[in-house]
Amino acid sequence: MTNIRKTHPLLKIVNESLVDLPVPSSVSSWWNFGSLLAACLAVQILTGLFLAMHYTSDTATAFNSVTHICRDVNYGWILRYLHANGASMFFICLYIHIGRGMYYGSYMYSETWNIGIILLFAVMATAFMGYVLPWGQMSLWGATVITNLLSAIPYIGTDLVQWIWGGFSVDKATLTRFFAFHFLLPFIIAALVVVHLLFLHETGSSNPTGIPSDSDMVPFHPYHTIKDILGILAMLTLLSTLVLFSPDLLGDPDNYIPANPLNTPPHIKPEWYFLFAYAILRSIPNKLGGVLALVLSILVLAVIPLLHMSKQRTMMFRPISQCLFWLLVADLLTLTWIGGQPVEHPYIIIGQMASIMYFTIILVLMPATSMMENHLLKW
């Protein structure tokens, strides 16, 4: 008798994705982050669902409802901090996942890569709107500053901002719609994840060597299920350590002050995972130029497949490209640090230099180095 997992219409899909899926035998732990992201999304949707049961999206009561969740709801504090720090874990996994894609040439599967970029934008939008919901000082002013950037769009900018706000400033209407979208978007993200996997399973996974691995495959279960479970346990250990010992480590103290439109915080900044893009935005004195640079800092990922000049797919056997890749990582860490600093000397010039470096490495140095390495292969 044939196994039910191979014949049942629903179980067959699960079987082909999680049990009998052929995986290259050489994939390393850097391939774990896809499943970690799925785990993060599950944690965020579950904790968010329970938080939404107690939260009120009204400017008069939003801050107090979050306080009520932390003080009066059974295990409300752990739900709130799991959700807030879960977002940080989400972005750590996301950035490592993208970095692995760049290092090992996974971007050559262009459909999977492009869906991934759409997913990144969706996750960033969700996280931004979530940051507004507690209605602290940084929530209000962060929302005001970031949404105001759209006013740089010629002709329609001002009208667009007022349309998003639902009035002439960030107020009750803005908070209500942000809550609605913050609740909706994770389910859209989950649907996009399915599409992401659909495209991935059309081509099969890449591997560290960059060499076709059709002749050397292992089944996903039990080898990679065990490996993924280990990764998920490690991530949950890190997350629970953060939540139980230092829940406010990555947050901003200003968000414990109720939102006050009459009092501007001395230094407005987003959550740490947006600081690199915020630093790029601030490094350009012109408003429209800054907004374009901000969008391009993420959209530049879309041109990476077009700039692949190397005869080898991965960077595994390309030491000069490896140095450039880690230089890019160091540059992003520098931008993250600069984004959290006040706008004054020497931070301004460091931010401008790091922003130029970011685009130069991706758009100029990496393709040029690939061509040089191709030439060296002929020796």
Curated annotation (Swiss-Prot):
Compartments, record wording: Mitochondrion inner membrane
Record: residues binding heme b b566: 97, 196
MF annotations from Gene Ontology: metal ion binding; ubiquinol-cytochrome-c reductase activity
Binding of heme b b562, residues: 83, 182
Family: Belongs to the cytochrome b family.
UniProt protein name: Cytochrome b
Keywords: Electron transport, Heme, Iron, Membrane, Metal-binding, Mitochondrion, Mitochondrion inner membrane, Respiratory chain, Transmembrane, Transmembrane helix, Transport, Ubiquinone
Reported cofactor(s): heme b
Quaternary context: The cytochrome bc1 complex contains 11 subunits: 3 respiratory subunits (MT-CYB, CYC1 and UQCRFS1), 2 core proteins (UQCRC1 and UQCRC2) and 6 low-molecular weight proteins (UQCRH/QCR6, UQCRB/QCR7, UQCRQ/QCR8, UQCR10/QCR9, UQCR11/QCR10 and a cleavage product of UQCRFS1). This cytochrome bc1 complex then forms a dimer.
Keyword field contains Electron transport: yes
Cofactor note: Binds 2 heme b groups non-covalently.
Residues reported in the UniProt entry to bind a ubiquinone: 201
Superkingdom of this protein's organism: Eukaryota
Note: Heme 1 (or BL or b562) is low-potential and absorbs at about 562 nm, and heme 2 (or BH or b566) is high-potential and absorbs at about 566 nm.
Function as written in the Swiss-Prot or TrEMBL entry: Component of the ubiquinol-cytochrome c reductase complex (complex III or cytochrome b-c1 complex) that is part of the mitochondrial respiratory chain. The b-c1 complex mediates electron transfer from ubiquinol to cytochrome c. Contributes to the generation of a proton gradient across the mitochondrial membrane that is then used for ATP synthesis.
SUPFAM superfamilies according to UniProt: a domain/subunit of cytochrome bc1 complex (Ubiquinol-cytochrome c reductase), Transmembrane di-heme cytochromes
One GO term (biological process): mitochondrial electron transport, ubiquinol to cytochrome c
Residues passing through the membrane, by range: 33-53, 77-98, 113-133, 178-198, 226-246, 288-308, 320-340, 347-367
Membrane-topology annotation of the record: Multi-pass membrane protein
GO cellular component terms, semicolon-separated: mitochondrial inner membrane; respiratory chain complex III
